[in-house]
Amino acid sequence: MSHILDKIDTVYPFPPKPIPLTQDEKAAYIASIKQLLKEKDAVLIAHYYTDPEIQALAEETGGFVGDSLEMAKFGNRHPAGTLIIAGVRFMGESAKILTPEKRILMPTLEAECSLDLGCPADKFTEFCDAHPDHTVVVYANTSAAVKARADWVVTSSIALEIVEHLDAEDKPIIWGPDRHLGSYIANKTGADMLLWQGECVVHDEFSADALRKMKAVYPDAAILVHPESPASVVELADAVGSTSQLIKAAKELPQQKMIVATDKGIFFKMQQLVPEKELIEAPTAGAGATCRSCAHCPWMAMNGLKAIETALREGGEQHEIFVDEALRVKSLIPLNRMLDFAEKLNMQVKGNV
């Protein structure tokens, strides 16, 4: 069973939307980025939720597109000395934790994540210290400082198995930061979980009422839902899973139409695998409401061509990720604990946002 803290409604200030580029400007930046990647011994690594042109450029230049842990692992294995991470700040930190000897650049260090922002390390540590008998399990979508306070770091693809393992040992659990994913796992496992009250601004906006209406319009469509969505939305799903798992489900399910309840950035890779299928954005607001994120992370949208080119060309403290070495070593412990557990289960760890 889960014990839920009082919900604190937080309205995160969104960054301004990037200024659109002309086709000529895009072509010029792409050409410059390709040249700079060679000159700087760098590789472009992009998250599924970045804009399609960024994902396409990463693949075209021998880089990678994936979820945050896959991104960090690819960067660790790649011979390039510099990794340019197109994503949000904790993804750059994850890459630095796994590969401290490499230079980690980001298009902007102001690309945040509402899950990270909603789980400040000092407050989370204070909360954990108040419950010393609990095992602390945190989602990968957190800062290095929060990871360092945890006993386990998990992604959504292995969270169920790890919580089941801890529950079998009768260990009460503190889960942070996503309340929807935590509630989903608690309901699936029956584990005793104390939930931190964070949420993803994109997934939190998906509406069950609006989704039912859309399903009535597309009765033959399958509904794919990320478990960071509200429980009422998850209940309507034909498939629930991480980014990688939803892409796999789109390929394996027989339906030719898919209503997809996650960031619409995923459509680029999903459509590559199922070009014959129709992908439909799940509605992010009910009748009479307006959306804020509108199914696309506003911080992911900051990873534009101009920002990537500037990061590669100029570098500097405005673009480079640094993690205190003592903190890095401490945060690596719960991360390796997950990877070792996955190896014993012979699972490939994927699936945080």
From Swiss-Prot:
Pathway assigned in UniProt: Cofactor biosynthesis; NAD(+) biosynthesis; quinolinate from iminoaspartate: step 1/1
Cofactor comment text: Binds 1 [4Fe-4S] cluster per subunit.
Localization (cell): Cytoplasm
A Gene Ontology BP annotation from the UniProt entry: 'de novo' NAD biosynthetic process from L-aspartate
E.C. designation(s): 2.5.1.72
Family: Belongs to the quinolinate synthase family. Type 1 subfamily.
Name the UniProt record assigns to this protein: Quinolinate synthase
Naturally occurring in which organism (per UniProt): Vibrio vulnificus (strain YJ016)
Gene name of this polypeptide: nadA
